[in-house]
Swiss-Prot record:
It comes from the Archaea. Pfam families: Lactamase_B_3. Gene3D superfamilies: Ribonuclease Z/Hydroxyacylglutathione hydrolase-like. It comes from Pyrobaculum neutrophilum (strain DSM 2338 / JCM 9278 / NBRC 100436 / V24Sta) (Thermoproteus neutrophilus). SUPFAM superfamilies: Metallo-hydrolase/oxidoreductase. Belongs to the UPF0282 family. InterPro entries: RibonucZ/Hydroxyglut_hydro (IPR036866), UPF0173_UPF0282_UlaG_hydrolase (IPR050114), UPF0282_hydrls (IPR014426). The lineage of its organism: Archaea, Thermoproteota, Thermoprotei, Thermoproteales, Thermoproteaceae. This is UPF0282 protein Tneu_0934.
Length: 305
């Protein structure tokens, strides 16, 4: 199994896009990218806009090769929209290149809030127009030659009862490596993502970590991350909300200590790519101070998640 990070906060954008290739199938997880319309009272810096365009170009390149594309849920950083968006770096036609002719494993409309149900409706229509094979993936399993792909039951996007609803995780096994992809579980804060990972016996776990800026129970999140370490994957990739904080390492320091004792490598998308971390959103104030730019208003339709 080969895998590569595509876009994520350590690479300068909001995303968890990740590419996995086995002997049998090529999967592009959550082919989306977006930027926070406002952070610290500021819109995206030109450096962020430039990076979003670069990530979008890489998504398009990898989508051309992919057999399967996933949509774990309908937040803007996890899918490619059917409408133009500066902050999602798309012209309103790129979704056809991402999804056209692909099998798309997507979250069902159950357990979604109103805004996500609305996006589900729009994306479902766009997928039909693009000639995609759309499959509601919740709890499903598929075989591609010697590769097995499983989707989790719906998992909470954050704490149980969260207004942001639920998401899907995925597990891929090719008989050698076993990779688990847990987007936007925000910790995890609940036991279900851990149970799904445990059942997959992962060698690699990619997990959306806790948002330190939302007031969630960070101690609980670190404890649950420790349970993922105890599964003894060779690599644990921390991603997404956690890396919207420049001090994220200090805030999960006990996890690094445990991982070192267990022989587990704690990685980021940037380290997997052999690149330095560029937490552009978390450094937005500094970017405007270091590289002054005109502060533009958010474009029409550009909203948080």
């Amino acid at each position: 199994m080969d895998f590569s990070p595509v876009g994520e906060e350590s690479l300068g954008v909001r995303s968890m896009c990740f590419y996995v290739e086995t002997r049998d199938v090529r999967i592009l997880f959550d082919a989306g990218v977006s930027l926070a319309p406002r952070r610290f009272g500021l819109p995206p810096h030109p450096r962020e806009l430039e990076r979003a365009r670069a990530v979008r170009a890489e998504i398009l390149r990898l989508a051309e090769a992919a057999d399967v594309v996933t949509v774990s849920h309908y937040h803007r950083d996890h899918f490619t929209p059917w409408y133009p968006s500066v902050y999602m770096a798309t012209d309103g036609e790129m979704y056809k290149r991402v999804y056209g002719g692909k099998r798309v494993l997507l979250k069902s409309p159950q357990d979604l809030n109103w805004s996500q149900r609305r996006r589900h409706y729009g994306l479902s229509k766009a997928l039909r127009e693009a000639g995609a094979e759309a499959v509601y993936a919740d709890g499903g399993e598929w075989a591609f030659g010697g590769t097995r792909v499983a989707a989790s039951p719906p998992l909470w996007h954050g704490p149980a009862g969260s207004k942001t609803g639920r998401v899907l995780g995925f597990a891929v096994s090719d008989g050698e490596e076993r990779l688990v992809f847990l987007p936007d579980v925000e910790g995890p804060l609940e036991p279900e993502p851990i149970a799904f990972a445990r059942g997959a016996r992962p060698t690699v776990v990619v997990v959306g970590g806790p948002p330190t800026y939302l007031g969630w129970d960070l101690e609980k999140a670190v404890k649950n991350l420790a349970e993922l370490v105890e599964l003894r994957p060779h690599t644990l990739v921390l991603a997404h909300h956690l890396l919207r904080d420049v001090q994220w390492r200090e805030k999960v320091a006990p996890l690094f200590e445990l991982a070192e004792r267990r022989g587990v490598v704690v990685a980021t998308y940037a380290s997997l790519a052999g690149r330095p971390e560029e937490l552009l959103e978390a450094r937005r104030r500094e970017l405007y101070a270091e590289e002054p730019a005109a502060v533009a208003e958010a474009g029409e339709g550009e909203e948080e998640d």
